[in-house]
Amino acid sequence: MTERPSEIVKFDNVGLRYSTDSEVLSDLSFTLFPGRFYFLTGASGAGKTSLLRLLYLAQRPSRGGIRMFGRDMITLPRGELPDFRRRLGVVFQDFRLVDHLSAFDNVALPLRLAGAEEAKVTKAVSDMLDWVNLSHRADALPETLSGGEQQRVAIARAVIARPQLLIADEPTGNVDPEMALKLLRLFEALNNRVGTTVVVATHDVQLIQKVPDSLIMRLSKGRLADPTGALRYPPQKAPGRAATATSKAFPPERRA
């Protein structure tokens, strides 16, 4: 009998309001399971970014409960938040690169903060910049990079430390279709080879169709539309994404 997988994230009747305004998120109940690939969709203003803010611990809900990695996020002391955030990789819409650091040093930041040996940092960052076609821009400061280049640096930084949960807000919005597909394949490699749970917010229907075994979470006016059992219970069959598959190369080697 297959052991029921643990839960990465569990929302229980979560609501969120800003100030005295009406709720921007209402009655959200769902579970994210290890090693799954999720797309978050919905019209502009549906609440996608607000939901992502809850996921990457930038916001606490107005009501309801959230558990992450087995801990209650509502009662978690703020002093413990940094340790939890180290388990996350986040791609923001506005990139949030460190202005005075080069592209290389921005990507290296999570590894250095984790205390990785500099030789390993150099190898990992060089490989990652090569994957996102930015080796030639390694020494460039963010202000000299195009929007698409900044986005690729932000994505490389988010995945470099092999997070347990990757959260990406419109990660392909500033790149051409060829690079968008390549970045999606990078997320899939992280998902397949490392076992990272991936949540991608996007309007791009074609992008969603390229990950056939993904699960779709659709928001409408702050509520989860058409919720399925897959968002509440683990899949009946293993998705083929093993959290123990860390021996495989990441990022994957380039094909000739």
Protein language model regions, located:
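Conserved ABC ATPase signature
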Residues: 141-145, 149
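Catalytic Walker B motif of ABC-type/P-loop ATPase nucleotide-binding domains
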Residues: 166-169
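Helix-to-loop junction immediately C-terminal to a conserved catalytic motif
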Residues: 56
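Short coil-to-helix segment of the ABC ATPase nucleotide-binding domain corresponding to the Q-loop/switch region
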Residues: 101-109
